[in-house]
């Protein structure tokens, strides 16, 4: 465990933010730097079959150290950090033996406060790693990477019985491309776990069904003084569309297993307007109903428009709820829960109000629930991780490997 913090601080020192709307994968050069660093470290540790694809997926194998027909399992984390907040020149602060109250984030007015983040009350006495208030931290998912790398070292150094352990580090998870170029056959694991969750004990095997909705509105612009019966204001049509979307089914009004419609962006002029929504729901039937609702709204608002003016709606599914795939293999969750209990952790099964690489991989034939990392408040300057949480994650990964080796 002595190198866990060192590894984490090393990884977050690299700016690995991904970038949306870029064709190339990985979308940024910084991700390549971390991938090459990890490749070198895996090779130095003596792992075999270390490969780095042209699309930035790094894979390696820790060979089994016991005989028998033990299923190969995998652990996966992503190298990119969120584009939502700067990841350049990350300057972590280490707060040992947290005693409560506000934590000043660097020099300035930014604080990490238990008033805004009550979970801090549960972390008294622990070592917190925070930002300096200017960037994100990168615990999502450099913490997961550091934990996997440390778990590999522990398995080797302590000669803990295990079967083949596959590891993979993927790019562009934060922009939805992490699993797109993942070669499940080459990975050759019976099942896997992403290490990309939050607080200690979290075990996630349910996520949203997700779709994007892009709406193009073409209007007609003339001088306002002579506009009667001629002007078709695309912005007004956009406002009417959004007024038809249920206001109480937005992200800020929902929680738990509740789905939502989210207007992510809207821009335009009288002549042309564009709207971008995302749709989320855990239930597949409700998910399909939400997509139909958007089509009905567009049809209603667009009824009776001049033929040269129109509303065009394009819906594209992004990913689906991995529950329907993971529950077909209950032992995957049983092993993870047992591993946590063996490490004095009470498992907390909760839905992901988002998605992970594991969601897509589960539908590609690799069942892949999500393990905790010990991090909180991802994608922003209030992000932090606890060293104790990271150590627990390492223990759970090691124990999962050990328990799997007992399933002969």
UniProtKB/Swiss-Prot annotation:
Provide the binding site for Zn(2+) 1.
78, 140, 196
Just give the chief location class.
cytoplasm
Which UniProt keywords are given for this protein, alphabetically ordered? Answer: Aminopeptidase, Cytoplasm, Hydrolase, Metal-binding, Metalloprotease, Protease, Zinc
Catalytic reaction equation(s): Release of the N-terminal residue from a tripeptide
Q: Does the keyword Iron apply?
A: no
Q: What is its EC number?
A: 3.4.11.4
Any one annotated GO CC term: cytosol
The residues that hold Zn(2+) 2 are 140, 174, 379
- Listed InterPro entries: ArgE/DapE_CS, Bact_exopeptidase_dim_dom, Peptidase_M20, Peptidase_M20_dimer, Peptidase_M20B
Gene3D superfamilies the record matches:
3.30.70.360, Zn peptidases
Instruction: Describe its function.
Output: Cleaves the N-terminal amino acid of tripeptides.
Under which name does UniProt file this protein? Peptidase T
């Amino acid at each position: 465990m002595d190198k866990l913090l060192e590894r984490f601080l090393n990884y977050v020192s690299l700016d690995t933010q991904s970038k949306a709307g870029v064709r190339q994968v990985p979308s940024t050069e910084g991700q390549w730097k971390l991938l090459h660093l990890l490749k070198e470290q895996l090779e130095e540790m003596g792992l075999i079959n270390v490969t780095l694809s042209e699309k930035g997926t790094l894979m390696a194998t820790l060979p089994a150290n016991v005989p028998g027909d033990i299923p190969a399992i995998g652990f996966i984390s992503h190298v990119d950090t969120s584009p939502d907040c700067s990841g350049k020149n990350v300057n972590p602060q280490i707060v040992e033996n947290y005693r409560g109250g506000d934590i000043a984030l660097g020099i300035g007015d930014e604080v990490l406060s238990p008033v805004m983040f009550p979970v801090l009350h549960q972390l008294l006495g622990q070592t917190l790693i925070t930002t300096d208030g200017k960037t994100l931290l990168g615990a999502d998912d450099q913490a997961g990477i550091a934990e996997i790398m440390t778990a590999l070292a522990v398995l080797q150094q302590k000669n803990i019985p295990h079967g083949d352990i596959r590891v993979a580090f993927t790019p562009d998870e934060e922009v939805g491309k992490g699993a797109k170029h993942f070669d499940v056959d080459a990975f050759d694991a019976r099942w896997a776990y992403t290490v990309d969750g939050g607080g200690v004990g979290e075990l996630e095997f349910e996520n949203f069904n997700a779709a994007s909705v892009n709406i193009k509105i073409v209007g007609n612009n003339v001088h306002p003084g002579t506009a009667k019966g001629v002007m078709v204001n695309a912005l007004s049509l956009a406002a009417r569309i959004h007024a038809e979307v249920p206001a109480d089914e937005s992200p800020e009004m929902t929680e738990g297993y509740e789905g939502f419609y989210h207007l992510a962006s809207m821009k335009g002029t009288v002549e042309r307007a564009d709207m971008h929504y995302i749709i989320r729901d855990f239930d597949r039937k409700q998910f399909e109903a939400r997509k139909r609702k958007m089509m009905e709204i567009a049809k209603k608002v667009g009824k009776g428009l001049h033929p040269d003016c129109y509303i065009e709606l394009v819906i594209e599914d992004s990913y689906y709820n991995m529950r329907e795939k993971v529950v077909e293999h209950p032992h995957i969750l049983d092993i993870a829960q047992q591993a946590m209990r063996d490490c004095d952790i009470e498992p907390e099964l909760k839905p992901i109000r988002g998605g992970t690489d594991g969601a897509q991989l589960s539908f590609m034939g690799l069942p892949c629930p999500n393990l905790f990392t010990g991090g909180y408040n991802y994608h922003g300057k209030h992000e932090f991780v606890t060293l104790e949480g990271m150590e627990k994650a390492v223990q759970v990964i090691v124990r999962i490997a050990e328990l799997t080796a007992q399933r002969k």
